[in-house]
Amino acid sequence: MAKVEVQQQGDLLEKLIAVNRVSKVVKGGRIFSFTALTVVGDGNGRVGFGYGKAREVPAAIQKAMEKARRNLVDVDLNGNTLQHPIKGRHSGSKVYMQPASEGTGIIAGGAMRAVLEVAGVQNVLSKCYGSTNPINVVRATINALTEMTSPDQVAAKRGLSVTQILG
C-alpha cells in the first residue's frame, strides 16, 4: 500500500510513496535497514523518482529525495492533461493512461497518483495492470509519460503542419 506524504521545498513538490523495513541476515542475526521511495516534481511537467536505503528512516527518505531531484525528466503536457492515450511498462507492471476532460480529476491509484500529481497532471483516467509493486508502477508511469509526444513533435517528424496532423 502506498502511503503518500506531501512536502513543498523551493519550487519542487516532494511526495513520499512508501517506506519499507528490510533485513540482511548475517551470522549474528538480522541487520535491519529502511528503504524509501519518493517522487519529486515542479507541478508543471517535470518529474523524477528516487529510491533510498539507510539504517534510519529519515536518512533513507533524504537519500531518496536527493536521487529524485537528480533524475528529473520533462513531460510534454497538454494544459493539465495528457497529449494522447499512453501505455507504459516496467517489469511486471503495466499502466494505461488517457487524457480526460476538465473537472475529471486524477483517477489513479497509489503510486501512479503521486507521480501524476507532482508532474502537474490534473485530469487523467488511468489503470494499472499486473504487478502493483510501487517501484515498478512508478517506473512504468514515468516511462509512459516520457514516451508521450506532442502534435508539434509528430508534425516535425512527418514534415507536415500541426493542422494537418490534428485533422
From Swiss-Prot:
Question: What Pfam families does UniProt report for this protein, alphabetically?
Answer: Ribosomal_S5 (PF00333), Ribosomal_S5_C (PF03719)
The free-text domain remark for this protein reads:
The N-terminal domain interacts with the head of the 30S subunit; the C-terminal domain interacts with the body and contacts protein S4. The interaction surface between S4 and S5 is involved in control of translational fidelity.
UniProt GO molecular function: rRNA binding; structural constituent of ribosome
**What are the GO BP annotations of this UniProt entry?**
translation
Note the InterPro entries from the entry: Ribosomal_Su5_D2-typ_SF, Ribosomal_uS5, Ribosomal_uS5_bac-type, Ribosomal_uS5_C, Ribosomal_uS5_N, Ribosomal_uS5_N_CS, Ribsml_uS5_D2-typ_fold_subgr
Name of this chain's protein: Small ribosomal subunit protein uS5
Instruction: Outline the extent of the S5 DRBM domain.
Output: 12-75
Q: What PANTHER family does the entry give?
A: MITOCHONDRIAL RIBOSOMAL PROTEIN S5 (PTHR48277:SF1)
Q: Which SUPFAM superfamilies does the annotation name?
A: dsRNA-binding domain-like, Ribosomal protein S5 domain 2-like
Known role: With S4 and S12 plays an important role in translational accuracy.
Give the species this sequence originates from: Pseudoalteromonas atlantica (strain T6c / ATCC BAA-1087)
**Entry's family note:** Belongs to the universal ribosomal protein uS5 family.
Taxon lineage: Bacteria, Pseudomonadati, Pseudomonadota, Gammaproteobacteria, Alteromonadales
